[in-house]
Amino acid sequence: MYKPQFMSIPPGTSLAGKTVLITGGNSGLGLEFARQVLVLNASRMIITVRSQAKGDTAIATLRADPEVRATNPNAKLQYFDLDLDDYESGLEFVRKVYADVSVLDILLCNAGTNFFNYETSMSGHERLMQVNCYTHFLVVLSLLPLLRRTAAKRASPTRVTFLSSYSHVHHTLESNPIAAEESVIAHFDNIKKYVSGKRYQDGKLVINAFVQRLASIVPSSEVIINCVCPGIVATDINQNLPLWIKPLMCVFFMIKARPVTEGGRVLVRAAVVVGEESHGRYLQTGEIHSGASFLCQPAGKQFIEKLWAEIVADIGKINPEVKVFD
């Protein structure tokens, strides 16, 4: 995986008056992104958690940070419950946002996990795809009206940024292609098609594909949608891997990983700094990158269209209020 260069944020960058929402903001990159955004004077910060204890700890950590205390001590900090393993939790989260949030300026889809073996989510899909992709897609599509209304109110675009990874170029869809008559979601749900240790890469490819397709129907003047690789950063993303592989990953991260502060800065650049030129694009080292060539090929374009149609249909069963117009 490519290791990004040091990224700086332009002097004078300010998020005063802005509301920022982060999935999985209680640890790792999400927590660091929250900290840096608060230092940029965001007025309201909402993170998602799966337990009250984690939420309380994260808020206390942010409140106690010396830079936050010095620059933005009066910011409104909150946590909302969200279990990405379950579509229904995603829907309840969306309802909570609409009930409590009148404007939304930045949505960072950061939460994620990694599994080595096949597992099934509470919603019945392969678990990594559910957590890293599908429930996030439900949240984004459901919150689009709020993001668009905020953009109209601000007279400037709002933002949606997904956490991606350079590892998506090592996906399995060329060596293990989806048949023309085969459903994309069914392919990923099929345990016989599951390649241990490779689903994380496939998930990031799915994110890149979704970002491209969503950006094709949402004007960048309303919502800037992109995805970004923060590089190799030491976080707890691999906590669910088998015990035998953890020592190997630990050594790898000790050698290759960069500080979480630098990874967080890359996310801030993608979600705050870069402009409409990043709409629908994958960013690496803080700059626009072509990403996996597969998505530019005929088979990749067919994959994008099939994925989009199936995701919209699947999410529509959970939240019929989602309206997507081509």
How would you label these PLM feature ranges?
Residues 211-215, 268, 308, 312:
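Non-transmembrane alpha-helical segments in soluble domains
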